[in-house]
Every structure is written in C-alpha cells, then in structure tokens.
Amino acid sequence: TDKVSLDEAAIVVSGGRGLKGAEHWGIIEELAEVLGAATACSKPVADMGWRPHAEHVGQTGKPVAPNLYIAIGISGAIQHLAGVNGSKVKLVINNDPEAPFFKAADYGVVGDAFSVVPELIKKLKARQ
C-alpha cells in the first residue's frame, strides 16, 4: 500500500516513547493503514532512532494540522503540542492520566496502548 504523506494527511497516527521500542511500531502502522492515515512520531522516538526524523512532529520537527491527530504513548511536551496545535481534533491514548497531552486533547483514553490500539483496530475493521 502507498503510504499517506504527512503533508497532506487528513488523519495522522503518531507514536511516542510509550511504545517502549521500535519493535512495537507495528500497531501505529496498522492503525494508520485502517484509517488511511499518515504516521508520525515524537522527537524522542526520532532521536532514539526508532523512526526517521522526517516523521518527527513538533516545534522542532514538522508542524501538522490534520482533521484528526491520534497521539499514542506521547506525554505531550510543550514543543510537541506546539507542532500539532492546528489539528482539528486531538485524541490521546496514554497510560499516564497525568500526561500533559490530556489537557490539550479533545478526547482521551487512559489505558495501555498495547491493549487499546489493537481493540480499536479490530472495531474499525469490523465497520469496514
């Protein structure tokens, strides 16, 4: 499948350090594929080499303003929030209820990405 470009994506699925390693990136790719979305990441993820810097979203990376921005395992540093501020709807999935991103989010799910995201993928596939 052709990957959706970050510049023109209506939906962006973005992953952070909460994914615990590059080997877990598959859930980001799979959710993006089901939604027809682009993938992105936080600066720490790019700095650790889990993803290319071209996918790094934020003040020091690429600013994005999709219709829907889904942040998975991203705590929400001010630099990251500045880069996604133009997003119409922000959905945050994080296991830390105190993550700053929840204050900036339109919708938030407090839960483990490794159980929430596969469940979301299953529900979305069932509706297709």
Regions found by a protein language model. Name each.
Residues T1-Q128:
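N-terminal glycine-rich FAD/FM-binding segment characteristic of electron-transfer flavoproteins
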